[in-house]
């Protein structure tokens, strides 16, 4: 019995004991990890609360530069420019006040490298005797003109230091240098040019880039017969034009216009009808004439045989309907 109990205890107790030991070891390691994370969180909170440490928007006073500091930097830059040294020597002398300025105020705030380069570039672009203005909203509109015209310094905020804004030196329509009279004269000149272009296009029947619309031959012939001057002809033609292209408007002449009411055979039919009318007294032979059964064509109003304007000899719906009804009727003898 003793050997059996020992064997059972070893078989069950050893795995259970090892599992408990491993659980205790992992728990201790987890507690150490939690303590380290808590310590890091406390350090981050202290850095955030510290005014001379991490970036915080609650302590804007530490991010603002004083006016005297800006004047000192600008005076150092003037001394560099007045010395007449260019190239690497001027850049080294320009970096010296920036380095001293950075070392002096490193405990207050952190200025990125791109911001220092932008400030140095803007200072070099300014003329001598003008104070520095680092307003981001003014720079976005017209930095150079605002800096030249505003001698008072603007108190720099944290947003102006963190957001890089490049000066736009391109001339603008509504800049402060432009005079109101010059602007009004420019607008009036543009309006006159537009009116001249519009009148030129109207005289040339140039209404855009759409394809030229077709014209009715009958209405064109009536307008030409009733008008004796070129003015009436131009009016009738322009009234029949829907949209003429700019390319086709340059070429004007007495060209034949297509008939809107033409069908596949009506063009040849019209020519055949004209030949028949002219040779009616001398020629007794009948020529084949295509007779329309609709009211599309105005020339053969006497030959209209159907009231439906969509019917002709190819699409005779009434006849087809009668044929269909007759086919449904019972035939005799069946």
Swiss-Prot record:
The keyword Membrane applies. Keywords: Cell membrane, Cell wall biogenesis/degradation, Membrane, Signal-anchor, Transmembrane, Transmembrane helix. Residues 204-217 have a biased composition (Polar residues). Signal peptide: none annotated. GO terms for cellular component: cellular bud membrane. Residues 76-110, 204-248 are annotated as: Disordered. One of its GO terms (biological process) is cell wall organization. Residues 81-96, 218-248 have a biased composition (Low complexity). Its main location: membrane. Residues 29-334 are cytoplasmic. The keyword Ligase does not apply. It comes from the Eukaryota. It is found in: Cell membrane; Bud membrane. The chain crosses the membrane at residues 8-28. Residues 1-7 are extracellular. It is a single-pass type III membrane protein. Plays a role in cell wall integrity. Affects the cell wall polymer composition in the growing region of the cell. Belongs to the SKG1 family. This is Suppressor of lethality of KEX2 GAS1 double null mutant protein 1. It comes from Zygosaccharomyces rouxii (strain ATCC 2623 / CBS 732 / NBRC 1130 / NCYC 568 / NRRL Y-229).
